């Protein structure tokens, strides 16, 4: 069963600063779903969240972020994933809320045979703006990463994407991809 975590903005002009530290030890398997929501669909607020995901040797980590802030929230989210040898990490980020949402994702593959999958879906309407920045950092040889972001825009909504794949000189046989689709 997945572990579910809920963060709420309950009042006008409220701020939240959630931090998730997830350490999956050797050969562990875990799924975490983190929800970000507002009690009122018009309440202004500010959210700045951080999560640190660590997949130990042979571990399997699945992380889902469901961001559904109200239409007047400014949201910042920083995600860091470290993948050790023969481990895998999959993160899925769903963005439908907030007036402005900035999402930064760093995935570091530090062990041979590590794999990281970075997936995101953003559905933007009215004048929403979703800004995504990513770095897939291949430090060890024989690692793999795959990024797939899909965006749906309506009205005057905007999405921004900046992604980088870095391969260290000794990280031979790296397999890395990025694809962003907009509709």
Language model regions located:
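Conserved beta-strand/loop scaffold segments within soluble protein domains that form the structured core
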Residues: 1-183
